[in-house]
């Protein structure tokens, strides 16, 4: 009987030791993420947390701009971050400012700018540059994001098409999450006739019809990447997260979200 109790106790001690070790190794990973990658990320969060025991603390904000919610602003203000999931071009700027660890960036996915109209309305032809230009001129109102895609449209593309002056008064910049909303929501309510954002931020939204990507000749491809923040306190756990996102399961989630995965290690 004594021997039996000894065996039981020894097993309990082993189990307790495993649980204690797991609790010690589990980390709270601070993640900053832009909206274009959020759909894929949100699908992976419960899987990652269940398999690793780590907890993801997520902060959302645009990759570019100087709003209080923008990731560059958050980092400059000293908000905690271990890993960033955002546009690669912005990461290069943050690296030069010493806010991102040089050499830590892993490229994850490619995205394009797309267009939506309100559900139930006619789908316009944007298959050529001229057709797209006509749609812009004919539209009564246009909505675009306050992040990378919208900045490109309002500062480069409209000028390139020679119609910036005609579009100025009918174009509207939409503040995105966390305190704002997707461009598609504005279009769905009928507050804008057409809307533009990253494809991954459009195709799963209710109340709109996805028209397609803007013409290839005008397209600005966006690359989403994941680096470590210079101030990361959970670098090892953050690297585990990056590898998980770059895995085949991560690639599947990215594809489902409308992104083109770059790796599936």
Name these PLM-found stretches.
Residues 85:
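Phosphate-/polyanion-interacting regions in eukaryotic proteins
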